[in-house]
A protein has these predicted regions:
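Hydrophobic membrane-insertion alpha-helices, especially the h-region
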Residues: 5-21
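Charge-dense, helix-prone N-terminal extensions
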Residues: 26, 45, 89-90
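Conserved small/polar residues in nucleotide/adenosyl-binding loops
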Residues: 165-166
Length: 166
């Protein structure tokens, strides 16, 4: 009877210790909220910021982390989400206010950016493409200097508001 009691106590200690470890550890790709507020408009992008770590991220090579023409969740861990409190014009098309899953299909000279109506799905798995709301093709440009960590930001300019992925 004492052995069963010790085994149960040991099992409980291991379970509690594991739970505390996994809930309190720093994620490898830190979570970020990028926000834009102007007048009554509020836009928000929630994503995780992976590091390059001397890896080939995009390319046609077999060892690229994200091969050209393949789904990418725009970050790491959970799906990247885009949220607007107002109806907006996104790439020339009106979209309703709300929260969307945002993902990309990178290519060498352009990226296809898509908003999907299932924002709460885990990002590793490809989305249900039937739930895509809008897809736009945007030109891509090589950076002059390599960046270590993925970044999404808003840029307000004379042409309107741009969402920049670096």
């Amino acid at each position: 009877m004492k052995i069963i009691k010790y085994v149960l106590i040991l099992t409980l200690v291991i379970l509690i210790g594991g739970f505390l470890y996994f809930t309190n550890r720093t994620p490898v790709s830190p979570f970020k909220i990028e926000e834009f507020v102007k007048d009554s408009l509020r836009l928000e992008v929630n994503y995780s910021r992976p590091y390059k770590k001397n890896r080939l991220i995009f390319g046609s090579e077999a060892d690229a982390l994200v091969p050209y023409g393949e789904y990418w969740r725009l970050g790491a861990d959970a799906a990247t989400t885009f949220e607007s409190n107002l109806d907006i014009n996104f790439g020339g098309t009106k979209i309703n206010s709300g929260k969307y899953r945002m993902y990309a299909v990178p290519n060498e000279n352009s990226w296809k950016i898509t908003l999907n109506s299932e924002p709460d799905k885990f990002g590793y798995f490809e989305p249900n493409y039937d739930k895509d709301v809008i897809s736009i093709d945007v030109p891509s440009q090589p950076l002059l200097n390599s960046l270590e960590q993925f970044t999404i930001s808003f840029e307000d300019n004379e042409n309107g508001l741009s969402l920049i992925h670096i």
